[in-house]
Amino acid sequence: MGFWENNKDSITSGLKSAGKYGYQGTKYVAKTGYKASKKHYNNSKARRERKSGKKNSSDEEYESEDEMEHERKPTDIRSLKDPKSFPPPPLKPGQKTYTGQQQQQMPNGQASYAFQGAYQGQPGAGSMEQSQYAQPQYNQYPQQQLQQGVVPQQPPIYGEQVPPYGSNSNATSYQSLSQQNQPQYAIPSQVSLNSASQQSTGFVSQNLQYGTQSSNPAPSPSFQNGLQCHQQPQYVSHGSTNLGQSQFPSGQQQQPTTQFGQQVLPSPAQPHPQPQQQQQGQPLPPPRGQVILPAPGEPLSNGFGQQQQQQQQQQQQQQQPLNQNNALLPQMNVEGVSGMAAVQPVYGQAMSSTTNMQDSNPSYGASPMQGQPPVGGQPPVPVRMQPQPPQPMQQGNIYPIEPSLDSTSSTPHFEVTPFDPDAPAPKPKIDIPTVDVSSLPPPPTHRDRGAVLHQEPAPSGKIQPNTTSSAASLPAKHSRTTTADNERNSGNKENDESTSKSSILGHYDVDVNIMPPPKPFRHGLDSVPSEHTRKNASERAVPILPPRNNVEPPPPPSRGNFERTESVLSTNAANVQEDPISNFLPPPKPFRHTETKQNQNSKASPVEIKDEVLPGHPSEEDRNVEPSLLPQSKPQSQSQSQFRRAHMETQPIQNFQPPPKPFRRSQSSNSSDSSYTIDGPEANHGRGRGRIAKHHDGDEYNPKSENSTENGRLGDAPNSFIRKRAPTPPAPSRSEKLHEGAITSEVDSSKDANKYEKSIPPVTSSIQAQQSTKKAPPPVVKPKPRNFSLKANEYPKELTREATGQDEVLNSITNELSHIKLRKTNVNLEKLGGSKKVKDSSPVPSDLDEKYVSASGSITPPRPPPSRSSPKKVPPVVPKKNDNLKKKPPVVPKKKPLLKSLEPRPIEMERAYSGDISAADDNLNPFERYKRNVVPQEDDRLHKLK
C-alpha cells in the first residue's frame, strides 16, 4: 500500500479543517479591519467636515462623544481659578518688565494702566501685598492721585492682592519694590509726593526698577530724571496737591514738599519720621513735575497695618485734595495718557509711565533710589522732575499703546485671549511715524530725465543750484523749476533751444549750462565760413557738428568767436578725413613696397642696413621725402596727393629696378635645374648676393665659404660669386648662414645693384634651400652634407637596410627628386673636392648610399646621416649616386627583402629617412628595434634573476 493510500483520509480531513478555520480567521480579520478602517475614515471625515462647517450625523456617531464635547465646549471662565491668585510668571532673561497692561478703573472713574511686568522682586515678609501691588503701581495713566483714596483700583493687578488694603496698595506696591532690594523700607518712611508730583513722577524708572531694583536701584534716579521728563508734564497741574502725604504713618499730610527734586533724600537708615519732618520743614509747594524721592529708612516692620490705618485715616483727610485733584485729573489724564501711553511702549525701560502712580507710587517709583542710598549709608541725591507741558509729550509720543481708557468706566477691564499654539510668536510691532509727504523734498531725478533738467537750464544762469545738489536744496530747486516752466511757457524759444543744446552737449547742470550755450552760439555765429566748413564736415561725416549747427539759432555776439573755432574744427575734421585719404596713400606705399621691397627687406636686416643700405638707399631718402609730402597732402586736394603718389612711385622705380627680382628668380630656377652652370653677373647676383649678404659683417665668412665672398661687395660681387660656388655645399653652418644672411646679403648687394637685393637671397638659398625644401626640410638637409664624416660609411650599411625598407614607402618620384638634388649638390661636392668622393666611394656603401639617398630624399649629399657629423664622406658618394641612382632604383626593391630579413632598423635611420624625428619615432615599433637582440637578452636576464 502506498503512503497516500494509507494517509489519504487523515490528510484530506486535516486540509479541510485547516482551510475551514483559516477561512474563518481571515474573514474575521477582514471584517474587523474593514470596520476599523471605516470608522477611522468616518472620524477623519467628520473632523474635516467639522472644520469646513459641515456635519454628518451618521459619521458623528462613530466619533467619541467625549472628544467632541471636549473640542466643542470651552471651559467656563467662571470655573477657572482667578489669575490674581497665581504668582507672576518669570521674566525672560532680557526682560525687565511685563509688557501687558491693564486698565484699572479708578474710583474717580479714571482708568489707569498697570504695568504688571515688574514682579521681579520676591515679596518680602509681610510684603506680599506690597509685591502684589507693585505691579499695579505701574499705572501709567495718571492714577496717581486717585489711588490714594481708592482701594479697589489696584485689585486688577495680577498677583496676590490684599483687597482690604485700600490706597495702601500703592504704598505696599511701592514697598514691594523697595522690599525687593530692601524689604524693610516701609512706605511711611517714604516722602509722600504731592499728587501732581506723584503723577509726574510716575517714574519710568519705577518700571525699570522692577527689573533692576534688586540689582541696580542706583541708576534708576538717572532714568527717573530722563524718563520723568517725558512723564512729568502730564502731571504738572497737580503739583500743588499733596496726595502722598497721607502715606506717612504719622498721618500728617505734609504740605507739598516744596522741593521734590530739592529735598534731600534722608539716608535709608533714618526712620521715616525724619523725612516727614524734613518735608514738613519745607513749606513751599513742590514745583510741577518735580519729585521728591522718599528715603527708604523704615523697615517693613512698620507693617501694612500701620500704613493701612494711617492711609485710611489719611484718605478721609485727603479726600478733599483728591477731589480737587480729581477735577484736574480728567485733563491730566487726557493729556498725560496720550503722552504716557507713548512712553509705555518702550519695553526695556518700562516706559509705561508709572507717573500715574498714586501717592505711594511716586515714592514707589523713587524706591530704587532709596534702595541704593541706604546701602551706601549716604543720603540719596534728590531727583528733580522738571515740569514740561503735557502736550509736547503727546506730540512726541507716537505709540498708540493707550488701551481704550474710559475715564468714566467704573470696572477694571481685563482682556484675555486664549492661547493659540499654532499662532506665530508675537513680534514687537514697529511703529512707523507718519510723515507729511508735502514736507519732504522732491526725490532726485536722473540728470538725463529731460523735463526738470531742461527747465532748470532754461533761465540764463538764474538757477544756480545743481541738479545733483543735496536733497535739502531739492525743494528750492523744484520751486525754481516750476518758475522756469512758467518762463518757458511765456515763450522763450531761445531758452528752449539753449536747454536742448545743453542737453545735447552732455547734460550740463544749471551752472554748467552757462558755458555750453556759447558753444552752440559759436557754432551759429559765422554763418558763411562756418556753413562752408559745416558742409565739408557734413560731407565728411563729422557727426557732432551738424546737429549743433541745426539746433543753433545765431545770436551774433557770442557765436562769433565760437563759430571761428567751429570753422577750425570743421577744417580739422576735413583734415581728419584727409588722414584716411593719406592713409589711402599706402596704395602708393604698396607700390613703394613693390619697388622698395628690396629696401624694406634690407631694413628687415638692420645690421646690413647700417653698412650697406645707407649708400644704396636713395630710395629711402625718397621715402623720407614722401612722408614730408604726405602731411602736406592732407590739407591739399586728393588729386595733388595722387600726383605725388605717382611721382613717388616713379622715384623708387628709378632708384630700384623691380625686374631683376623676377630675373633673379628665373636664374634661381635655372640654376636649380642647371646645377651651378650659371655664369656672369647674373649667377653672381643670384647666388653670390644671397651668400654674400648673410651678415653685413663680411669677416664671418671665410674665402672658402660662400659668404666669405661678402668681402668683395658690390664691384667684387662677380668674382666673389665664382669663389662662392665651390665652397657652398661643404659648410653646414654656411647653409644656415645662407638662410640667415639671405636677407642681409640682399642689403649688401643693394650697394652695387639696388634692384637685386631682395631677389638675391632667395636665389642663393634657392640652390640649396629650395632644393632642400622640395625633398627634405632645409635645416636638416644642409647640416647633413656638411657634417658627413667617415662614420657615415659605417652607418650606411644599416642605413641602406633601413632606407631600403623605407624605399618601398618612397615612390619613384622621391627617388627622382633625390637624384635631382644630388645632381645639384654634386656640382658643389665636386668643386669641394673629388678626393673625398674617392675616399667615400666604396662598392657596397655606394649602393647603400644611393638607396639611402633615394629613401631620404635629401637635397644635400647622399647619406642622410644617422650621425650628421660625416659631411666629407657624403659628397664623394653623391656623384656616384647621381649616376647610379638613375640606374639603381630597380635595385632598391631587391635589397628591400634582404633588409627586411635583416635586423630591424635603428631609429636614426628612420629619422634620416623621414627627416622628422617625431614622425619617425611615432612610426617606429620598439619591439622591431629590439626584438632580436634585446628580447632574448631580457629572457636570459630573467632566468639569471631567478
From Swiss-Prot:
Pro residues composition bias: residue spans: 376-392, 861-878
Membrane-protein topology: Peripheral membrane protein
Region of interest (Disordered), ranges: 1-333, 351-903
Compositional bias of kind Basic residues: 36-54, 887-898
Record keywords: Membrane, Phosphoprotein
Skewed-composition ranges (Acidic residues): 59-68
Predominant place of localization: membrane
Residues with the Phosphothreonine modification: T728, T860
Subcellular location: Membrane raft
Compositional bias (Polar residues): 166-244, 351-364, 463-472, 762-773
Biased composition (Basic and acidic residues): 69-84, 485-499, 523-538, 608-625, 748-758
Disulfide bonds: none
Single Gene Ontology BP annotation: barbed-end actin filament capping
Bias (Low complexity) ranges: 93-105, 130-158, 245-267, 306-320, 627-642, 666-675
InterPro entries found in the cross-reference section: Aim3 (IPR031370)
Gene Ontology cellular component terms for the protein in this record: actin cortical patch; membrane raft
Subunit annotation: Interacts with RVS167.
Sequence similarity: Belongs to the AIM3 family.
Protein name as it appears in the record: Altered inheritance of mitochondria protein 3
Gene: AIM3
